[in-house]
Amino acid sequence: MVSRGCSITVLFRFLIVLLVIQVHFENTKAARHAPVVSWSPPEPPKDDFVWYHKINRFKNIEQDAFRPTHQGPSQGIGHKNPPGAP
């Protein structure tokens, strides 16, 4: 049989643990805020042809921008002294 002192000690320890857990969860509960959810309607799906046309248009601009101006190796690549170096 369990002595009365032992049962009181076990009960006291259980209450202390319960109190610590309650204090811990109460603090975390008070620190949390409800997340703000803003709902907006989804965008309509894009037309594949328009999307493809836009990509090609930008690629053509990039290709025109980097065309070499004259024949031969690129200036500054493969030379010990690139053009414009003192």
UniProtKB/Swiss-Prot annotation:
It comes from the Eukaryota. Residues 31-64, 80-86 form a propeptide. Residues 1-30 form the signal peptide. Expressed at low levels in flowers. Present in lateral roots, shoot apical meristem (SAM), flowers and siliques. GO terms for cellular component: apoplast. Induction: Slightly induced in roots by nitrogen and ammonium chloride NH(4)Cl starvation. Accumulates in response to osmotic stress (e.g. mannitol and salt NaCl). GO terms for molecular function: hormone activity. The modification Hydroxyproline is found at P68, P73. Residues 63-86 are annotated as: Disordered. One of its GO terms (biological process) is nitrate import. The keyword Hydrolase does not apply. Keywords: Apoplast, Developmental protein, Hormone, Hydroxylation, Secreted, Signal. The mature small signaling peptide is generated by proteolytic processing of the longer precursor. Interacts with CEP receptors (e.g. CEPR1 and CEPR2). Belongs to the C-terminally encoded plant signaling peptide (CEP) family. Extracellular signaling peptide that represses primary root growth rate. Promotes shoot growth and modulates leaf morphology. Regulates systemic nitrogen (N)-demand signaling. Mediates up-regulation of genes involved in N uptake and assimilation pathways. This is Precursor of CEP4. It comes from Arabidopsis thaliana (Mouse-ear cress).
